[in-house]
């Protein structure tokens, strides 16, 4: 099926990614580890823009940019150079930003996503290096603030800005692109997406193939999707009333879920770009072969290998490779000799599902334990051991625990009981699978006590069977196997 795109929606993204895995900033020796530091303590004359301070390029940042370009299947420039982008704003103490203009380090890449009609290619126009400005802290909301504080700890942080073609046709495709793009960056180990401000997105969107509007500085993938949904609705309403869309820059108010006009959209000439005289042009083609050798197995290749090596479904392979540390955890479990298909089910469906429900983000994996932090409160930490998943998968495969009991074990561990093994939890909670005679007795009692549901089922109401199974599970405190309970009920009622 071909997606017709009835509203003529075109979405392009500009993604600003901090290379926060590097030790020092883009053009000076200040540490990039500033997130728990007091304001304006990770600064120097270079990142404060003091007169006479000269930049020194961080070679590791260039290598990271090349690595990103190769992973995006882009062309690496034979020669690249920096420019000054001139504008006056409090977060930019020099009065200009050191960036790249007509000689970006990467061009003509692509990312393949799951689109509205199957696989969909999103073109990468360019990816270029630049420095991050400082951070403005508004007192109150951005609209009503009576004062602004400035923290220059972020000033000079190494950034890669990646610009896509307007190839996305819905907010859902835009979010899927961001998920895939972030996944690639995490596999490359160039940034930590759990840190504040690690990725910021500007979204350009138009409807009916018309004038585009830019929505600036969105900090989450969900926020991008929400902002685009609102902005598309707003533009369609303007056109429906006979109005015209103005090319402008808007801000997304996360709390209210609306976009707010900030200013008319600037053109490139408004920034008066000119070459940075304090940094020489670079020829980097000689670096490429060595950097290419360091590229890891990327998400698509790992997904294909998981399906072939472990015999798991495409859905499970996609979920498991959506985070590199989750993929490593799964392989750690499989290395212990358990059934990889059962391990995939419990890791991708249950463990990952619980993490999403609890708003926990994967933060570490050391070969033995996978760690999590709460997305909104990094002080909340949790973990899950490889050995615990191996034990749980083994108990389930041997028929010693039901699926409901296994889910209860995972939830109990994530509730802060990492020190207890699955067997201990099962013993304490009485979760070992019920004996057949106990299940048979529970089935008989359930049928006797629920005559109305029995008659509904016999009359063709299939959902009544689910109710009866639930009653059996309740009587056995979740220790019965749901499939066995269902089969026994059907056999008892229909012979």
Curated annotation (Swiss-Prot):
Pfam families: GatB_N, GatB_Yqey. InterPro entries: Asn/Gln-tRNA_amidoTrfase_suB/E, Asn/Gln-tRNA_Trfase_suB/E_cat, Asn/Gln_amidotransferase, Asn/Gln_tRNA_amidoTrase-B-like, GatB, GatB_C_1, GatB_Yqey_C_2, Gln-tRNA_amidoTrfase_suB_CS. GO terms for biological process: glutaminyl-tRNAGln biosynthesis via transamidation; translation. It comes from the Archaea. Transmembrane segments: none annotated. GO terms for molecular function: asparaginyl-tRNA synthase (glutamine-hydrolyzing) activity; ATP binding; glutaminyl-tRNA synthase (glutamine-hydrolyzing) activity. It catalyses: L-glutamyl-tRNA(Gln) + L-glutamine + ATP + H2O = L-glutaminyl-tRNA(Gln) + L-glutamate + ADP + phosphate + H(+); L-aspartyl-tRNA(Asn) + L-glutamine + ATP + H2O = L-asparaginyl-tRNA(Asn) + L-glutamate + ADP + phosphate + 2 H(+). Keywords: ATP-binding, Ligase, Nucleotide-binding, Protein biosynthesis. Gene3D superfamilies: 1.10.10.410, GatB domain, N-terminal subdomain (1.10.150.380). The keyword Membrane does not apply. Its EC number is 6.3.5.-. The keyword ATP-binding applies. Heterotrimer of A, B and C subunits. HAMAP family: GatB. Allows the formation of correctly charged Asn-tRNA(Asn) or Gln-tRNA(Gln) through the transamidation of misacylated Asp-tRNA(Asn) or Glu-tRNA(Gln) in organisms which lack either or both of asparaginyl-tRNA or glutaminyl-tRNA synthetases. The reaction takes place in the presence of glutamine and ATP through an activated phospho-Asp-tRNA(Asn) or phospho-Glu-tRNA(Gln). Belongs to the GatB/GatE family. GatB subfamily. This is Aspartyl/glutamyl-tRNA(Asn/Gln) amidotransferase subunit B. The gene is gatB.
């Amino acid at each position: 099926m071909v997606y017709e795109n009835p509203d003529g929606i075109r979405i392009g993204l500009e993604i600003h990614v901090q290379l926060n895995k590097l030790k020092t900033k883009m053009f000076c020796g200040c540490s990039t580890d500033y997130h728990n530091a007091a304001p304006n303590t990770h600064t120097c004359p270079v990142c404060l823009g003091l007169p006479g301070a000269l930049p020194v390029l961080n070679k590791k940042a260039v290598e990271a940019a090349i690595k990103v370009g190769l992973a995006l299947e882009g062309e690496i420039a034979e020669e690249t150079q920096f420019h000054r982008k001139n504008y006056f704003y409090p977060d930019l103490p020099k009065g200009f930003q050191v960036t790249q203009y007509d000689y970006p380090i990467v061009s003509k890449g692509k990312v393949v996503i799951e689109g509205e009609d199957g696989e969909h290619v999103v073109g990468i126009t360019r990816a270029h290096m630049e420095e991050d400005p400082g951070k403005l802290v508004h007192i109150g909301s951005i609209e009503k603030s009576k004062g602004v504080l400035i923290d220059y700890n972020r000033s000079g942080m190494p950034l890669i800005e990646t610009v896509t073609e307007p190839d996305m046709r819905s907010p859902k495709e835009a979010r899927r692109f961001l998920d895939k793009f972030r996944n690639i960056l995490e596999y490359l180990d160039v940034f930590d997406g759990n840190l504040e401000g690690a990725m910021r997105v500007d979204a350009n969107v138009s409807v009916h193939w018309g004038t585009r509007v830019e929505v600036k500085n969105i900090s989450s993938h969900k926020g991008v999707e929400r902002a685009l949904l609102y902005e598309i609705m707003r533009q369609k309403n303007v056109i429906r009333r006979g109005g015209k869309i103005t090319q402008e820059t808007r801000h997304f108010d996360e709390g209210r879920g609306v976009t707010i006009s900030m200013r008319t959209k600037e053109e490139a000439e408004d920034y008066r770009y000119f070459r940075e005289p304090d940094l020489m042009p670079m020829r980097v083609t000689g670096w490429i072969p060595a950097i290419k050798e360091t590229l890891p197995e990327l998400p698509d290749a790992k997904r294909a290998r998981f399906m072939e090596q472990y015999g798991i479904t495409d859905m499970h392979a996609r979920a498991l490779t959506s985070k590199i540390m989750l993929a490593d955890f799964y392989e750690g479990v499989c290395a212990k000799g358990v059934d990889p298909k059962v391990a995939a089910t419990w890791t991708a469906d249950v463990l990952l599902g619980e993490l999403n429900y609890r708003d926990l983000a994967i933060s570490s994996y050391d070969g033995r334990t996978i760690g999590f932090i709460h997305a909104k409160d990094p002080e909340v930490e949790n973990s899950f051991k490889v050995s615990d998943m191996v034990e749980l998968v083994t108990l389930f495969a041997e028929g010693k625990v039901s699926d409901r009991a296994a889910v209860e074990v995972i939830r109990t561990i994530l509730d802060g009981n990492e020190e207890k093994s699955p067997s201990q939890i099962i013993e304490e909670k009485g979760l070992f699978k019920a004996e057949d005679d106990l299940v048979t007795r529970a089935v008989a009692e359930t049928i006797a006590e629920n005559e109305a549901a029995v008659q509904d089922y016999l009359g063709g109401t299939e959902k009544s069977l689910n109710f009866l199974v639930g009653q059996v599970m309740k009587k056995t405190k979740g220790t019965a196997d749901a499939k066995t309970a269902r089969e026994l009920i059907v056999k008892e009622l229909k012979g």
